[in-house]
């Protein structure tokens, strides 16, 4: 009886061990599925259908400049420029409504007069009439671009000279800045022209990159066809 009891107990213990072992094996087979490495889904963006490229001429009587711009854009003469009254009639915008984009274009005569905001001792600003000095306007162009440095991942500037004899500087701003493309052109003696591309959306470098790359070629075309017409 004693031997029989031992055999029965051993068999019972063996059955328990087998049960737990089988349970552990089953759980271990399920663990890879439950604890497999998580892979995040790539964030996608809507596909953008870009128009076929084509250009038309902007050449208005009395304007001191001309250039070519895309046929799928609109040249708009606004009454204000960044909520400021226009200082001369030669400030215009190039709108791309399908992209929610706009190129702001401003013009000043070197040696001419412009209204400037002068900071007072109490922190307020007062309008003041000053002379357009070439060096000051170049400095202002760099300052306006560098205002984006807090959100920009990079700011690069490059000097260019076109076949039409136009010299200027182009700025490329990386990251989630409000503007990724800015430039200015001047003959250093009479004319100063500045442009900046903005989007009417929250800046996102990844989602805007395809549109920015597309519009970069249009900006290049504008610069390469640009001429002074007041000579």
Feature map (PLM): residue ranges:
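N-terminal targeting sequences that direct proteins away from the cytosol to non-cytosolic compartments
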Residues: 3-9, 15, 32-100, 111-118, ...
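A short, hydrophobic, proline-anchored segment that marks a local hinge/packing element in signaling
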Residues: 182-188
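Bacterial N-terminal signal peptides
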Residues: 16-30
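Short, Gly/Ser/Thr-enriched beta-strand-loop segments that form substrate-interacting elements
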Residues: 166-181
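Generic short N-terminal amphipathic or hydrophobic helices
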Residues: 2-3, 24
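Short hydrophobic beta-strand segments that form the core of ligand-binding sensory/regulatory domains
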Residues: 194-198
């Amino acid at each position: 009886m004693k031997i029989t009891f031992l055999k029965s107990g051993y068999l019972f213990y063996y059955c328990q061990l087998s049960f737990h072992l089988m349970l552990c094996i089953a759980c271990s087979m399920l663990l890879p599925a439950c604890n497999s490495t998580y892979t995040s889904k790539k964030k996608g963006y809507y596909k953008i259908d870009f128009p076929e490229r084509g250009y038309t001429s902007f050449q208005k009587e009395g304007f001191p400049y001309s250039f070519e711009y895309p046929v799928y854009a609109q040249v708009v003469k606004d009454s204000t420029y960044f909520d400021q009254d226009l200082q001369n009639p030669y400030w215009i915008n190039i709108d791309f409504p399908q992209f929610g984009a706009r190129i702001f274009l401003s013009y000043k005569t070197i040696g001419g007069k412009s209204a400037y905001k002068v900071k007072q001792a109490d922190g307020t600003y007062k309008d003041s009439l000053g002379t357009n000095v070439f060096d000051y306007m170049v400095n202002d162009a760099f300052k306006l671009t560098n205002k984006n440095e807090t959100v920009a991942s990079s700011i690069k500037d490059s000097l260019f000279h076109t076949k039409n004899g136009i010299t200027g500087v182009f700025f490329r701003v990386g990251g989630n800045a409000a503007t990724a493309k800015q430039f200015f052109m001047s003959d250093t003696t009479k004319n100063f022209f500045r442009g900046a591309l903005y989007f009417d959306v929250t800046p996102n470098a990844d989602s805007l990159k395809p549109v920015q790359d597309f519009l970069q070629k249009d900006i290049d075309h504008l610069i390469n066809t640009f001429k002074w017409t007041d000579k």
